[in-house]
Amino acid sequence: MQIIVVGVNYKTAPVEIREKLAFGEAELGEAMKQLAKQKSILENVIVSTCNRTEIYAVVDQLHTGRYYIKAFLAEWFDIEAEAIAPYLRVLEGEAAAGHLFRVAAGLDSMVLGETQILGQVKGSYLLAQEIGTSGTILNHLFKQAVTFAKRAHSETGIGAHAVSVSYAAVELAKKIFGHLNGKHVLIIGAGKMGTLAAQNLYGNGVGKVTVVNRTLEKAKQLAAQFDGEAKSLGELSCALLEADIVISSTGAKGYMLTKEEMAPLEKMRKGRPLFMVDIAVPRDLDPALAELETVFLYDIDDLQDVVAANLAERQKAAALIEEMIEGELVAFGQWLQTLGVVPVIAALREKALAIQAETMKSLERKLPHLSERDRKVLNKHTKSIINQLLRDPILQVKELAAGPNADEALQLFMKIFNIEDAVKAEQRSAQRAEVQLRDEQQAEAVRAARPSWQL
C-alpha cells in the first residue's frame, strides 16, 4: 500500500483551470464515495478550496492509482484528461505525507501561515471518516497533520504578524490605542482597500463606523455593512471631531485634508489622539498632518514596510515549522512500518496456537483418562509456554519493523518461521474487513441522509 497525492493548486494551475476542478461542498462526500469504488483506491480524502483541489489516497499500486485518480477527475468534471494533465501535481510516499503537513500548517498557502486551510483540511478528513472513505492510514495521517498544525502555529506564532496592507492598519492601530474596543472609525471613500481595512477593524471590536464619500448612496451601502452612519463630503469636519481612527482611500487629485484644515479641529478634540491611515495613491492626506502633536499619520509605504517586516517574521517561523515537519515524518514513517508487522505477528501467533491445539488433541488421544479439569490445566499451561516463547520474537520483529531495511528484515523473519503464506492470508483478510467496514459505513451514511418518509 502506498500514499499518493494528485491535484492542482495555485502554484501549478491558473484560476481558469482550478475553477474547472473545484468540488462543491455539497458534492464532496459523493465524490469521495465514487472515487472509493475505483480500481486500486483503498482510501481517499479530497481537499477542495478556492486555491487547490487535491486527492489524498492510499492505493495498492502507484501506477494504477495515479491512472484511476486522473481518470476520475476527468470523468467527474467532464473534461479531457489530456487538458488537465500538464497542471496536475503528483506526490508519492513520504513526499505526499510531507505535503499534507505543509498544507495543514499553511506553508503551502497563498498567504503564508494562514489558518483557514487547517479548518478546511480537518473538515474534509472528518467527512471522509464519517462516510467511510478514509481508513487506518489516512485517519492516522490526517489526525497527526491537524494536531501538528495546531502545535506549529501555537509554538511559532506564524499567524501573529499581519501580511496584508488592510490588516497592517489594524496592527498599527492596536499599538497606538492598546485595544480597539469602542473606538470610532471614519472611512473616507468607499474603495476596495478602505472597505477591507474597515472590515478588519470592525472584526476587532471597534464601536462605531462612519463612512464619508462624494456619493452619499455609496457611503450608505458601505456603512450598512457595519451598522454604521453615512455622511456627505461636506460633513467631513464634523466626522473628524468624533473619530479615533481615519482610513482614507479616495484616490482623488489633491489632498482631502490638509494640516491647515486639521489644526483648528485638533484643538477642538482636546488632545485626543487621532490615528490616520492614507492608503490612497495618489495620497489623500497632507503629509504635514504628521507634524500635529496628536495626529499619527501613516501612508501606504509605511504599511508596506510593516507587511514586509511581518512577512520576514513569518518566513522565519515557516523555516522552524519545516524542521518540525521532518520529525513528524520520522514518527509517521515509524508508525507505518509497525503497521506492516501486524499481520506478521498475527500469523506467528496463529501458527503457534495451531501447534498448541494439535498437541492438546494428541495428549487427549494418548491420555484418555484425563479429567475435564486436567485438560483445562494442560491447555492453560501449554498456551502459557507458547506465549512465553513468542514474547522475545515479537519484541524483536517490532524493532526490526521500525529500523532500517525493515522490508528485508521482515522477509527474513517470515522465512525463518515459514509463515510467508500465512502473512499474505492475514493481509487479504484485513483488506476484506476494511472494505466491508467501509461499505457498511457508506450504507449507514446513505440511510442517515434518507428522508424519514422513505424509510
Curated annotation (Swiss-Prot):
Q: Which UniProt keywords apply?
A: NADP, Oxidoreductase, Porphyrin biosynthesis
Site annotated as Important for activity: where? H99
The superkingdom listed in its UniProt entry is: Bacteria
An example Gene Ontology biological process: protoporphyrinogen IX biosynthetic process from glutamate
Q: Which residues of the sequence carry a binding annotation for NADP(+)? A: G189, A190, G191, K192, M193, G194
Q: Which residues are noted in the entry as substrate-binding? A: T49, C50, N51, R52, S109, E114, T115, Q116, Q120
Q: What class of enzyme is it?
A: oxidoreductase
Pathway given in the UniProt record: Porphyrin-containing compound metabolism; protoporphyrin-IX biosynthesis; 5-aminolevulinate from L-glutamyl-tRNA(Glu): step 1/2
Q: Which EC number(s) does UniProt give?
A: 1.2.1.70
Q: Which GO terms describe its molecular function?
A: glutamyl-tRNA reductase activity; NADP binding
Q: What does this protein do?
A: Catalyzes the NADPH-dependent reduction of glutamyl-tRNA(Glu) to glutamate 1-semialdehyde (GSA).
Q: How does it assemble?
A: Homodimer.
Query: What does the further note read?
Result: During catalysis, the active site Cys acts as a nucleophile attacking the alpha-carbonyl group of tRNA-bound glutamate with the formation of a thioester intermediate between enzyme and glutamate, and the concomitant release of tRNA(Glu). The thioester intermediate is finally reduced by direct hydride transfer from NADPH, to form the product GSA.
What PANTHER family has UniProt attached to this entry?
GLUTAMYL-TRNA REDUCTASE
This chain belongs to the protein called Glutamyl-tRNA reductase
What gene makes this protein? hemA
